[in-house]
């Protein structure tokens, strides 16, 4: 089973994934972008840009990472439990300048039509995002601010709705303000 955690920065995806690592010791844990050597380099380029990157070029860099990630991680482990911190879904939401049909077609190509079966979508409000962003050093994406994140979160919801029409997926939407223990319990039940 391929399980994906989605949500904007600061909603607790990494915390919940860490808790699952204690339970699912044989699972494959990965992340996008950055789950491969190529991905680590591309992530570094994209998060710490010193020169502006055109939106189309940025999209294609993420797609290159996704295709490599599929080949190195997802494809060879598709009969195991795979738990990923983000996926093509975030890619579609962050590439909000492009149409969903185009993004879906490009991602389908990069992933050879291998999609997650279950998605855990953690949602946060402006207060939660503000509080958590204030506690860390910000990368170039995080410096775009709360309004940017909330617009991406809105786009994530729209992408998830779009995908329900295209592929067979189960989605669990959770309020990131809940305690990490309560969220963990709900996630464990969803993965049963």
From Swiss-Prot:
MF GO annotations:
ATP binding; dTMP kinase activity
Xref: SUPFAM superfamilies: P-loop containing nucleoside triphosphate hydrolases
| NCBIfam families named in the record | DTMP_kinase
So where does ATP get bound? 7-14
Q: Which GO terms describe its biological process?
A: dTDP biosynthetic process; dTTP biosynthetic process; dUDP biosynthetic process
| Matches recorded under CDD domains | TMPK (cd01672)
Superkingdom of the source?
Answer: Bacteria
According to its UniProt record, this protein's enzyme class is transferase
Q: Which reaction does it catalyse?
A: dTMP + ATP = dTDP + ADP
Q: Which family does it belong to?
A: Belongs to the thymidylate kinase family.
What is the E.C. number? 2.7.4.9
Q: Does the keyword Kinase apply?
A: yes
Q: Which HAMAP family match?
A: Thymidylate_kinase
Q: Which GO terms describe its cellular component?
A: cytosol
User: What is this protein identified as?
Assistant: Thymidylate kinase
Alphabetic keyword roster: ATP-binding, Kinase, Nucleotide biosynthesis, Nucleotide-binding, Transferase
Say what the protein does.
Answer: Phosphorylation of dTMP to form dTDP in both de novo and salvage pathways of dTTP synthesis.
């Amino acid at each position: 089973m391929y399980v994906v955690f989605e949500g904007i920065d600061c909603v607790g995806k990494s915390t919940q994934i860490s808790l699952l690592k204690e339970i699912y010791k044989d699972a494959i844990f990965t992340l996008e972008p950055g789950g491969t050597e190529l991905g680590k380099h591309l992530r570094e380029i994209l998060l710490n840009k010193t020169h502006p990157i055109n939106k189309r070029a940025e999209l294609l860099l993420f797609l290159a990472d996704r295709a490599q990630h599929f080949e190195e991680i997802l494809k060879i482990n598709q009969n195991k439990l795979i738990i990923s911190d983000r996926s093509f879904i975030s890619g579609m939401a962050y590439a909000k300048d492009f149409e969903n049909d185009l993004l879906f077609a490009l991602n389908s190509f990069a992933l050879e039509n291998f999609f997650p079966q279950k998605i855990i979508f953690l949602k946060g409000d402006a207060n939660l995002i503000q509080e958590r962003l204030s506690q860390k050093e910000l990368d170039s994406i995080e410096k775009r601010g709360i309004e940017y994140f909330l617009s991406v979160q809105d786009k994530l919801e729209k992408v998830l709705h779009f995908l329900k029409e295209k592929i067979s997926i189960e989605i669990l939407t959770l309020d990131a303000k809940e305690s990490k223990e309560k969220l963990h319990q709900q996630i464990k039940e969803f993965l049963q």
